[in-house]
C-alpha cells in the first residue's frame, strides 16, 4: 500500500479536475453544515483530521458523481476515494464556493468566520443523533442579545442573515476568494494603524492555511480486485459506524453487480416523481426481503448477481404496487404522512406474496391494518427490523393479515385511542400523521386561502405546515410557566399554509381566530369559547381538544374498511 501526503488545496484541485473520483460503492454526500463548521474549526486549530483512503484500480470501474461540480472531461487512471468523501467534498465546496447537491437540490455550504473571536476558543463538540436530519439549522436562527454573545465566542458558525450582518463575521469562502484589503475594509478596519489590523490579518492568514493542511493518503495497489476493495471499504466504515447498514449493503451489491447503482437511482427518482421520495435503503430492503424472506442486510454477501438481478425486477413491481396502494387505497399520498417508511416494505411484500391478486375483503383488511400500524407507530418504537421481519414471516406463512393484527395488538395493547394516550404526542407521532388524514377526509382547508390541506400544494406560500394554535412565541410571553413540550402537544397543533402561519405569527388565539371561518377551525377541532382562547385557558383548551382528537381518530380508523 502506497502512502503520500497531499495538501487540502491539491486534493480539492484533484476533485475539480476529475483526477479523484468516487467508486460506485460510495454513499451520497450526507454531511450537514454543522459538521462542515466543526471540520473547519478543527483544521483552524490545527487538530488532526484523520487519513484519506484511495485506490488506484488497474481497470476502469463504475463511478458516481461528487456532490460538487467537477470537470466532465474523461481522465486517464483517476484515483478512487474510499474514505474521506465527506471531508473532501465539504472542503471543496467551501474553498471553491461551489454548492453541494443533496436530494437532487443544490444548496450552498455557507460558514461564517469570526475575525474577533476570543484567543481562547469555545469548544463546540456536539453528540450526533443516529437519525440526524439532513436539514441544516442556523447557529442563530432566533437572534437575541444573549445568543449573539454566545455566538461571538466561536470562531465558526453556520451562516445566518443576522450574524452575517455583523462586521466581524466573514464568509469562509470569501477568505479564499478575496484579498485582505477587501475583507478588512468590510470589517471596519480603516488602515494599518487600526488596532485590529494585525490581529485580523493574522487570523485571515491562519484560516487560509487550512488549504495547506496535509492529509496522509493511503493508496491501495492496482492488484486488488473490486471485490476485495469493497470488503476493505465495508470494514473501514463499519469500524467507526460511519455508514448505515444500507450503505454497506449497497457497496456489497455494486461489487457483485457492476452498474446496478444507476438502475437503483433511476427507479428511486421515478418513484419520487410519483410523490414517494423514499431513501434508497427502503427499496434495497424490499429487494432483500423478496429474495430472502427477511429484511436484514446480513445475507447480502451470499447473494449472487443473478439472484440480485431477478430480485430487482420483482422489487420494482412490488414497489409500484405499494405506492399505488398507499396513494389510491389508503389515501397516503406522501411519505411525510407515514410514521415509518417500513410500512411500504410490508405493503410491497404483501402484494408480491398475494401475486397481486387481491380481493375486496383482503384489500380492505390490509388498508385497515396499514392505518392502524401507522397511527400506533408499529415501526417507530424501537427494534424496527425485528418487528418488520415478524410481519414478513406472518405474511409468508399465513398469506393473509390476521397475523399482522395479532402482532400489532401484542405490541400496543389497544387499537383505539384515549385522550390519555395522546398526552405528549407531537408532530412526529403516527397519531398526528393520522390526524392529518382524518382532517383531510373531513374537508379541512387552510384558514385563509380555503385550499384543501395537502402535502402536495405547489409554492412555498401554500405549503402546509403544522401550526401551534397557541403560538410558541406567544406562550413564552403570556404563559412562561407552561413547559415547551406541552405547547408542542398534538392537542395544540393544526394544519395551515406557510403564509397563514406567518401571518398569525405570535398573535393570541383570541386576536387571530375571529378573522377565520369558525367552520374551518372546527374542521380541525379548534373550538374556542369565552375562556379557552385566553392564555389562562390553555390547559382547558388542550384537554377539551385532546378528547375530540381521540374520538375523531377512533372514528376515522373504525371506518377504514368501508372506504
Go through each PLM region and give its residues.
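Short, amphipathic alpha-helical segments that act as regulatory/interfacial helices
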Residues: 40, 92, 230-233, 344-352, ...
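Histidine-centered nuclease catalytic patch
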Residues: 457-492
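An acidic intrinsically disordered interaction segment
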Residues: 186-206, 294-321, 463-466, 470
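Intrinsically disordered, low-complexity N-proximal targeting/linker segments that flank membranes
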Residues: 375-466, 474
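Short amphipathic alpha-helical segments and their helix-coil junctions
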Residues: 19-26, 205-222, 227-231, 267-270, ...
Amino acid at each position: 500500500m502506497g502512502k503520500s501526503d497531499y495538501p487540502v488545496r491539491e486534493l480539492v484541485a484533484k476533485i475539480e479536475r476529475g483526477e479523484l473520483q468516487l467508486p460506485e460503492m460510495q454513499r451520497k454526500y450526507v454531511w450537514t453544515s454543522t459538521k462542515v463548521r466543526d471540520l473547519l474549526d478543527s483544521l483552524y486549530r490545527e487538530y488532526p483530521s484523520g487519513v484519506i483512503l484511495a485506490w488506484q484500480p488497474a481497470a476502469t470501474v463504475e463511478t458516481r458523481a461528487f456532490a460538487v461540480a467537477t470537470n466532465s472531461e474523461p481522465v486517464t487512471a483517476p484515483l478512487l476515494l474510499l474514505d474521506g468523501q465527506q471531508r473532501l467534498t465539504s472542503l471543496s465546496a467551501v474553498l471553491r464556493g461551489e454548492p453541494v447537491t443533496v436530494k437532487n437540490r443544490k444548496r450552498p455550504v455557507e460558514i461564517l468566520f469570526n475575525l474577533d473571536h476570543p484567543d481562547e476558543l469555545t469548544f463546540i463538540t456536539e453528540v450526533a443523533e443516529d437519525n440526524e436530519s439532513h436539514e441544516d439549522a442556523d447557529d442563530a436562527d432566533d437572534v437575541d442579545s444573549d445568543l449573539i454573545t454566545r455566538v461571538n465566542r466561536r470562531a465558526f458558525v453556520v451562516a445566518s442573515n443576522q450574524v452575517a450582518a455583523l462586521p466581524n463575521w466573514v464568509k469562509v469562502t470569501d477568505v479564499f476568494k478575496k484579498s485582505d484589503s477587501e475583507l478588512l475594509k468590510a470589517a471596519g478596519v480603516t488602515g494599518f494603524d487600526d488596532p485590529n489590523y494585525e490581529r485580523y490579518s493574522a487570523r485571515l492568514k491562519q484560516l487560509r492555511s487550512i488549504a495547506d493542511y496535509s492529509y496522509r493518503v493511503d493508496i491501495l495497489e492496482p492488484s486488488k480486485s473490486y471485490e476485495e476493495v469493497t470488503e476493505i471499504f465495508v470494514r473501514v466504515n463499519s469500524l467507526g459506524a460511519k455508514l448505515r447498514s444500507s450503505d454497506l449493503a449497497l457497496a456489497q451489491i455494486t461489487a457483485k453487480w457492476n452498474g446496478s447503482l444507476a438502475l437503483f437511482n433511476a427507479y428511486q427518482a421515478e418513484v419520487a416523481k410519483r410523490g414517494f421520495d423514499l431513501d434508497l435503503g427502503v427499496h434495497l430492503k424490499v429487494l432483500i426481503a423478496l429474495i430472502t424472506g427477511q429484511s436484514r442486510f446480513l445475507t447480502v454477501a451470499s447473494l449472487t448477481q443473478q439472484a440480485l438481478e431477478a430480485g430487482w425486477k420483482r422489487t420494482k413491481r412490488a414497489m409500484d404496487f405499494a405506492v399505488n396502494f398507499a396513494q389510491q387505497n389508503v389515501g397516503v399520498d406522501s411519505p411525510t404522512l407515514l410514521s415509518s417508511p417500513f410500512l411500504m416494505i410490508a405493503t410491497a411484500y404483501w402484494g408480491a406474496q398475494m401475486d397481486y391478486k387481491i380481493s375486496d375483503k383482503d384489500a380492505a383488511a390490509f388498508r385497515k391494518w396499514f392505518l392502524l400500524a401507522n397511527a400506533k407507530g408499529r415501526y417507530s418504537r424501537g427494534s424496527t427490523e425485528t418487528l418488520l421481519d415478524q410481519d414478513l414471516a406472518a405474511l409468508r406463512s399465513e398469506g393473509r393479515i390476521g397475523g399482522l393484527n395479532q402482532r400489532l395488538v401484542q405490541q400496543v395493547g389497544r387499537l383505539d385511542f384515549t385522550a390519555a394516550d395522546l398526552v405528549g404526542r407531537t408532530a412526529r407521532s403516527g397519531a398526528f400523521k393520522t390526524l392529518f388524514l382524518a382532517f383531510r377526509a373531513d374537508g379541512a382547508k387552510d384558514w385563509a386561502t380555503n385550499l384543501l390541506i395537502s402535502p402536495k400544494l405547489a409554492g412555498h406560500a401554500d405549503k402546509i405546515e403544522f401550526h401551534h394554535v397557541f403560538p410558541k412565541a406567544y406562550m413564552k410571553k403570556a404563559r412562561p410557566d407552561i413547559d415547551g413540550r406541552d405547547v408542542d402537544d398534538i392537542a395544540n397543533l393544526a394544519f395551515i399554509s406557510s403564509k397563514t402561519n406567518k401571518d398569525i405569527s405570535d398573535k393570541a388565539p383570541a386576536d387571530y381566530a375571529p378573522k377565520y371561518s369558525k367552520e374551518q377551525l372546527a374542521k380541525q377541532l379548534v373550538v374556542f369559547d369565552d375562556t379557552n382562547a385566553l392564555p389562562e385557558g390553555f390547559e382547558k383548551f388542550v384537554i377539551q381538544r385532546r378528547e375530540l382528537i381521540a374520538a375523531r381518530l377512533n372514528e376515522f380508523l373504525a371506518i377504514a374498511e368501508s372506504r
